[in-house]
Amino acid sequence: TGRYYGGGSTPVPEARMTDGVLHTVLVKNVSKARFATLFGSYSAGDYKKLPQGIIRVSTAKVVRIEALEGDLTTCLDGESMHSQCVTLKLADKKVNFFAPKGCDPDATAR
């Protein structure tokens, strides 16, 4: 949850659950072999060390992704969906979490 996904990948370590923005990572169209060589740095959050122009990180309240042709396959919490466009919108504090007193939602889980 938060800034981690996929078994501990943290591509944008500065992301926080409470910062009010979606942190998006756009990986330029690279081959699977090329991405495999970059994945360690990407997963560790060292995107600033990657070659210029391969990855773009930005923040937004709304992200809309449209397929140039065909459908996109989107996976959300293990469920796959197919559509021509996907819109992600940040909901402002719509979920309440209960945690032990003094627990910081932005603290590192590691």
Where are these regions (language model features)?
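Long C-terminal subdomains/extensions of small-metabolite kinases
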Residues: 1-110
